[in-house]
């Protein structure tokens, strides 16, 4: 073998799939699987079998193409170690940096409000239905839970970071186990309700409207955008110097594709298992009760007549506990991002970016008071969680995940090679449909 052949062979071996690629595949997958997944079966199953089958077809393209677009934006910066804020500033100046900071903050903060409502409702339904205690005052419950989480965050942040990272995989395993365990309870109710003669494409309960609203919850549930910037920086530092940027882009796309496949497989199996165990009418009731699907499953098994199996009794309690842990995990992770974003905004606009004018402790205190105070107000008001996701959470995520990369591809010279592609049209349409949910909710 010649020297040149040896070099090519060595480079091919080094550039093949690495352990770090597997680690990042699982990391992206684990980031997306959180409390938001607990609401996807409700929205997906609300319209019955045909809409959820259409969502199954759309799930992977939405997850893959949208996150790949964001990764390409992150890859387009001249500095391999530059994050998304630096890249946007490079393309669009300081104004672009301010816009991305606002987008990141407002993409995460509404999620905290959603989780504040969710954890309050989940705890209250567990307290009343599984433990059998008298109802508590909602304002007191929300305040107690938020103060408890604030205490843990304030005094044990480093420990909680480790604990939450360890909880990702047990939570995913729990979802898969519950999905499998529900199989003996599957029934044909969702199939029996399919009447092809009475199906409507349009109208409030039509297939198109149901799938349109389902796109929002998919954007929300299949979302690992907060970690994409760190992921791209890591891969650029690992591959770009030796193999070039085009190779790094293909490697990032490959990792995102595999993570998306895993994510869609787990979430859609969980959604179908819930739908075949319950029914579209049950999903509508869960939406009206404003609780995640695991809490509804717990209540469903609690209300079963006759002799209950050991599994049914176990699931009745385990489902609510798993839901509470999942929501706390998601709340904590999003709190850290919101805190960092709000600290940056306060520093930028309140102190003109001068870090010497205010201590980190004071910044954290001011931000915590605003975050926890606003979350308590929303949790006490108890807006419908799915409506909140569709009207606030998902549209802001779509702005960051879909429309910002498409705008950059249109305007930035370093992204010109991606112009004119069909997948760009798909990502743009998904982003616009998600944002238009705001208009639909107003009328």
Curated annotation (Swiss-Prot):
> Keyword Cell membrane on this protein?
yes
Its name, as the record gives it, is Threonine/serine transporter TdcC
CC annotations in GO: plasma membrane
Annotated GO MF terms: L-serine transmembrane transporter activity; symporter activity; threonine efflux transmembrane transporter activity
Q: Which domain of life is it from?
A: Bacteria
List the InterPro entries: Amino_acid_transport_2, Hydroxy_aa_transpt, Thr/Ser_transpt_TdcC
NCBIfam families membership: PRK13629.1, stp
Keyword Transmembrane appears in the UniProt entry: yes
Q: Name the species this protein comes from.
A: Shigella flexneri
Q: What does this protein do?
A: Involved in the import of threonine and serine into the cell, with the concomitant import of a proton (symport system).
* Membrane-spanning ranges: 22-42, 44-64, 97-117, 140-160, 163-183, 207-227, 261-281, 311-331, 366-386, 389-409, 423-443
Enumerate the UniProt keywords alphabetically. Amino-acid transport, Cell inner membrane, Cell membrane, Membrane, Symport, Transmembrane, Transmembrane helix, Transport
Its annotated compartments are:
Cell inner membrane
């Amino acid at each position: 073998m010649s020297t040149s052949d040896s070099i090519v062979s060595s480079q091919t071996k080094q550039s093949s799939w690495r352990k770090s690629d597997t680690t990042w595949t699982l990391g992206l997958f684990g980031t997306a699987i959180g409390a938001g997944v607990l609401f996807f079966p409700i929205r997906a199953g609300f319209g019955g079998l045909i809409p959820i089958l259409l969502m199954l077809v759309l799930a992977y393209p939405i997850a893959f193409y949208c996150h790949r677009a964001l990764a390409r934006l992150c890859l387009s910066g001249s500095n391999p170690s530059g994050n998304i804020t630096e890249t946007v500033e490079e393309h669009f100046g300081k104004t672009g940096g301010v816009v991305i900071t606002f987008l990141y903050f407002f993409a995460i903060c509404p999620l905290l409000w959603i989780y504040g409502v969710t954890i309050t409702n989940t705890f209250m339904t567990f307290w009343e239905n599984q433990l059998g205690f008298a109802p508590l005052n909602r304002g007191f419950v929300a305040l107690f839970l938020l103060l408890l989480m604030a205490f843990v965050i304030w005094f044990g942040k480093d420990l909680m970071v480790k604990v939450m990272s360890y909880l990702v995989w047990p939570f995913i395993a729990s979802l898969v186990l519950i999905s499998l365990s529900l199989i003996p309870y599957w029934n044909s109710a969702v199939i029996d309700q399919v009447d092809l003669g009475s199906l409507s494409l349009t109208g409030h309960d039509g297939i198109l409207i149901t799938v349109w609203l389902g796109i929002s919850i998919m954007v929300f549930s299949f979302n690992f955008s907060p970690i994409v910037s760190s992921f791209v920086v890591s891969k650029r530092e690992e591959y770009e110097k030796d193999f070039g940027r085009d190779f790094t882009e293909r490697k990032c796309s490959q990792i995102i594709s595999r993570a998306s496949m895993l994510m869609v497989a787990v979430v859609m199996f969980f959604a179908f298992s819930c739908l075949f165990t319950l029914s579209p009418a049950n999903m509508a009731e869960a939406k009206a009760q404003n609780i995640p699907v695991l809490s509804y499953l717990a209540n469903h098994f609690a209300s079963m007549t006759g002799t209950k199996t050991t599994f049914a009794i176990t699931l009745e309690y385990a489902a609510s506990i798993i839901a509470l842990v999942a929501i706390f995990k998601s709340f904590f992770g999003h709190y850290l991002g919101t805190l960092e974003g709000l600290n940056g905004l306060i520093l930028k606009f309140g102190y003109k970016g001068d870090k010497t004018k205010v201590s980190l402790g004071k910044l954290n205190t001011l931000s915590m008071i605003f975050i926890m105070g606003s979350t308590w107000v929303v949790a006490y008001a108890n807006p419908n969680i799915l409506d909140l996701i569709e009207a606030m959470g998902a549209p802001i995520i779509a702005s960051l995940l879909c429309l910002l990369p498409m705008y950059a591809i249109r305007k930035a010279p370093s992204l010109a090679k991606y112009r004119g592609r069909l997948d760009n049209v798909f990502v743009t349409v998904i982003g616009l449909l998600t944002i238009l949910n705001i208009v639909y909710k107003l009328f």
